[in-house]
């Protein structure tokens, strides 16, 4: 099965960087990689326990802004960190997906949140 990958922009309020994200309807919350945390050095805002493939681990949470391709406004997120990046640095979870129109049709993907256009 193919992965749904796209571009997102993450900001700490001072800097903004582009990252590759994967869309995961099985993930309850949006999370970011160590690379995002290292690049942007955001403020910590609590912690959470996350389940990875190998184990449950404690992860700090951070305050960041996420911008989606084709949208002019950003979304405030409070992501945890999933660890080392792979081919993507952001996992978009249902905390964001539930607010928009998620379409996967014959291999073509689109996602829109009308309020952020």
Segments from the language model and where they lie:
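Pepsin/retropepsin-fold aspartyl endopeptidases
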Residues: 1-117
């Amino acid at each position: 099965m193919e992965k749904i990958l796209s571009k997102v922009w993450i900001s700490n309020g001072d800097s903004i960087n582009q990252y590759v994200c994967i869309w995961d309807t099985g993930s309850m919350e949006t999370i970011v990689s160590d690379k995002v945390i290292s690049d942007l050095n955001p403020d910590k805002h609590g912690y959470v326990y996350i389940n990875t493939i190998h184990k449950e681990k404690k992860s700090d949470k951070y305050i960041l802004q996420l911008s989606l391709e084709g949208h002019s406004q950003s979304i405030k997120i409070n992501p945890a960190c999933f660890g080392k990046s792979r081919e993507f640095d952001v996992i978009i979870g249902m905390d964001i997906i539930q607010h928009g129109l998620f379409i996967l049709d014959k291999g073509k993907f689109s996602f829109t949140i009308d309020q952020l256009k």
